[in-house]
Curated annotation (Swiss-Prot):
Pathway: Cofactor biosynthesis; pyridoxine 5'-phosphate biosynthesis; pyridoxine 5'-phosphate from D-erythrose 4-phosphate: step 5/5
Catalyzed chemical reaction(s): 3-amino-2-oxopropyl phosphate + 1-deoxy-D-xylulose 5-phosphate = pyridoxine 5'-phosphate + phosphate + 2 H2O + H(+)
CDD domains reported in the protein's UniProt record: PNPsynthase (cd00003)
EC number(s) on file: 2.6.99.2
Quaternary state and interactors: Homooctamer; tetramer of dimers.
Residue stretches spanning the membrane: none
Name of this protein: Pyridoxine 5'-phosphate synthase
Length: 243
């Protein structure tokens, strides 16, 4: 059974910051708190439109993290150049559409083997470990192994979005089968997308799982669990000002 790690995605700390164009909340501070709480790594997605994480965030995080940095990115010349310069510990190559709210599916590795092979080699030559974000599909898993990626990250969105227990069980079985197949090819298996406090345990129980990358659910829970203290502190400061 693989050691199970947690990668915390802090993109939506940056989303909240950018909504008002302020310097807070700071993703770097959030990363530090996550590490102190037990995160094994920090994940950020530098999108082409820079809708949340910025180039500056990436540079500072790379310099300050105590754990590992996982940079999610599209396979473009701009992003590859940034990765080679920044040298995160990991790069997860994801498909990207400007109009999407969040990543909608896995990378089509089988349909673009040469492009993915070149990207994997370029990143590996820079000392970066590569993961390919793919659906739980044997053809894509075989292609990932063929292009030289040591890791895959299985897209768990269909599992997370399942409308019925039967549908969710079917998706879980598909993910578990894919994880076993990937491990048989020598790939290390990560997973992520849509995982929450209610659905994570079944995925975590899959023996081949190495790391789960979770962000939105954790940030959403943090807002609720921290709201009481935040309101109380503001009220205390106001009353102190009146003596």
């Amino acid at each position: 059974m693989a050691e199970l790690l947690l990668g915390v995605n802090i993109d939506h700390i940056a989303t909240l910051r950018n909504a008002r164009g302020t310097a807070y909340p700071d993703p770097v501070q959030a990363a530090f708190i996550a590490e102190q709480a037990g995160a094994d790594g920090i994940t950020v997605h530098l999108r082409e439109d820079r809708r949340h994480i910025t180039d500056r965030d990436v540079r500072i995080l790379r310099q300050t993290l105590d754990t590992r940095m996982n940079l999610e990115m599209a396979v473009t010349e701009e992003m590859l150049a940034i990765a080679v310069e920044t040298k995160p510990h990991f790069c997860c190559l994801v498909p990207e559409k400007r109009q999407e709210v969040t990543t909608e599916g896995g990378q089509d590795v089988a349909g673009q083997r040469d492009k993915m092979r070149d990207a994997c080699k370029r990143l590996a030559d820079a000392g970066i470990q590569v993961s390919l974000f793919i659906d739980a599909d044997e053809e894509q898993i075989k292609a990932a192994a063929e292009v030289g990626a040591p890791f895959i990250e299985i897209h768990t969105g269909c599992y997370a979005d399942a409308k019925t227990d039967a549908e969710q069980a079917q998706e879980l079985a598909r993910i578990a089968k894919a994880a076993t197949f990937a491990a048989s090819l020598g790939l290390k298996v990560n997973a992520g997308h849509g995982l929450t406090y209610h659905n994570v345990k079944a995925i975590a129980a899959i023996p081949e799982m190495h790391e789960l990358n979770i962000g939105h659910a954790i940030i959403g829970r943090a807002v609720m669990t921290g709201l009481k203290d935040a309101v109380a502190e503001m009220k205390r400061l106001m009353l102190e000002a009146r003596g």
